[in-house]
Amino acid sequence: INLKAIAAMAKKLL
């Protein structure tokens, strides 16, 4: 998992 994947997931959760 990279930062972009984390950012995308966080964006969905928020």
From Swiss-Prot:
Primary location: secreted
Q: Does the keyword Secreted apply?
A: yes
Keywords on this record? Amidation, Antibiotic, Antimicrobial, Fungicide, G-protein coupled receptor impairing toxin, Immunity, Innate immunity, Mast cell degranulation, Secreted, Toxin
Q: In which tissues is it expressed?
A: Expressed by the venom gland.
Q: Which GO terms describe its biological process?
A: defense response to bacterium; defense response to fungus; innate immune response; killing of cells of another organism
Write down which residues bear the modification named Leucine amide: 14
One cellular component (GO) term of this entry: extracellular region
Function description: Shows mast cell degranulation and antimicrobial activities against the Gram-negative bacteria E.coli ATCC 25922 (MIC=3.0 ug/ml), the Gram-positive bacteria S.aureus ATCC 2592 (MIC=1.5 ug/ml) and the fungus C.albicans ATCC 2002 (MIC=12.0 ug/ml). Its mast cell degranulation activity may be related to the activation of G-protein coupled receptors in mast cells as well as interaction with other proteins located in cell endosomal membranes in the mast cells.
The name on file for this protein is Mastoparan-like peptide 12d
Organism name:
Vespa magnifica (Hornet)
